[in-house]
């Protein structure tokens, strides 16, 4: 005789009746019930639905965007992440800035960001977008970092970054989205107009480009004794008026 006999139909019905009459008793989860019910939270369900529906607004201004264009092809296939490029900011929840941002384009970028619905995210792609890149030292029009205009969630350094780096940024952004809560999104503060404010601390300085670059102290011609000693000819652009007359006289 088996030590644990299989209960018959009458015993099972009696046990179910006792559970109904005494609901405080500890319930038993059957195998069928455990295989057909998923326990989750509203945050996880909402974030799971948004992970595969990131619709980007592509804001490409320079050579970095050519690397992003490679993702559209079949070799990389960014559709696997559910990325659907949109042409309208009202239909996008992600804006990808790739390339140099100039002062003249800054108001347009801020306006596009403000027209996007919440929640919205920003990916800064390339050195020119993050810090100004090669134009950060002497350019009078390049913005030294797009984060001075709009808040950035993920940075992709490189000049230009490869498509694999863009995939890595998308994965990191998906992790950030999956950890958000409804309470956190409800308490997001409104974006301020950081591009321009009346209380700025800008100071007027002398212009850098004055047209007198060759007349600076570091660009003056060497003494005539030195040029004669080493036999170095004087470039016409660096020659003074007196030296030019001497050259013309032979």
UniProtKB/Swiss-Prot annotation:
Localisation per UniProt entry: Cellular thylakoid membrane
Cofactor binding annotation: Binds 1 [4Fe-4S] cluster.
Gene3D superfamilies xref list: 3.40.50.12280
Keywords (A to Z) from UniProt: 4Fe-4S, Iron, Iron-sulfur, Membrane, Metal-binding, NAD, NADP, Plastoquinone, Quinone, Thylakoid, Translocase, Transport
Source taxon at top rank: Bacteria
Pfam families assigned to the protein according to its UniProt record, in alphabetical order: Oxidored_q6 (PF01058)
Binding site for [4Fe-4S] cluster: 63-64, 128, 159
Membrane topology of the entry: Peripheral membrane protein
Reaction equations catalysed: a plastoquinone + NADH + (n+1) H(+)(in) = a plastoquinol + NAD(+) + n H(+)(out); a plastoquinone + NADPH + (n+1) H(+)(in) = a plastoquinol + NADP(+) + n H(+)(out)
Cofactors (names): [4Fe-4S] cluster
Biological processes, Gene Ontology terms: aerobic respiration; electron transport coupled proton transport; photosynthesis, light reaction
Top-tier EC class: translocase
GO cellular component: plasma membrane-derived thylakoid membrane; respiratory chain complex I
EC number, as in UniProt: 7.1.1.-
GO molecular function: 4 iron, 4 sulfur cluster binding; iron ion binding; NADH dehydrogenase (ubiquinone) activity; quinone binding
Self-association state and partner proteins as the record states: NDH-1 can be composed of about 15 different subunits; different subcomplexes with different compositions have been identified which probably have different functions.
Described purpose of this protein according to its UniProt entry: NDH-1 shuttles electrons from an unknown electron donor, via FMN and iron-sulfur (Fe-S) centers, to quinones in the respiratory and/or the photosynthetic chain. The immediate electron acceptor for the enzyme in this species is believed to be plastoquinone. Couples the redox reaction to proton translocation, and thus conserves the redox energy in a proton gradient. Cyanobacterial NDH-1 also plays a role in inorganic carbon-concentration.
HAMAP family listed in its UniProt record: NDH1_NuoB
UniProt similarity note: Belongs to the complex I 20 kDa subunit family.
Name this protein carries in UniProt: NAD(P)H-quinone oxidoreductase subunit K
Organism whose genome encodes this protein: Rippkaea orientalis (strain PCC 8801 / RF-1)
């Amino acid at each position: 005789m088996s030590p644990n006999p299989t209960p018959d139909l009458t015993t099972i019905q009696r046990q179910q009746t006792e559970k109904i009459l005494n609901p405080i008793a500890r319930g038993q989860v059957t195998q069928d019930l455990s295989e057909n019910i998923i326990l989750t939270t509203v945050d996880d369900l909402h974030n799971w639905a948004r992970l595969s529906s990131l619709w980007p607004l592509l804001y490409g201004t320079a050579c970095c965007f050519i690397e992003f264009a490679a993702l559209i092809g079949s070799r990389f296939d960014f559709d696997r992440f559910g990325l659907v490029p949109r042409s309208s900011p009202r239909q996008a929840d992600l804006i990808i800035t790739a390339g140099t941002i100039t002062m003249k384009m800054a108001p347009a970028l801020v306006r596009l960001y403000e027209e996007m619905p919440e929640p919205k995210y920003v990916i800064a792609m390339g050195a020119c977008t993050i810090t100004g890149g090669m134009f950060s030292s002497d350019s009078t029009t390049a913005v030294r970092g797009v984060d001075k205009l709009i808040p950035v969630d993920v940075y992709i350094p490189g000049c230009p970054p490869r498509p694999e780096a863009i995939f890595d940024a998308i994965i990191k952004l998906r992790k950030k989205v999956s950890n958000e809560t409804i309470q956190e999104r409800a308490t997001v503060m409104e974006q301020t107009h950081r591009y321009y404010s009346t209380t700025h601390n800008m100071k007027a300085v002398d212009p850098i480009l004055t047209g007198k670059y060759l007349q600076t102290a570091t660009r003056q011609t060497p003494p005539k004794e030195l040029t004669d000693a080493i036999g170095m000819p004087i470039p016409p652009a660096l020659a003074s008026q007196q030296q030019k007359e001497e050259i013309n006289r032979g």
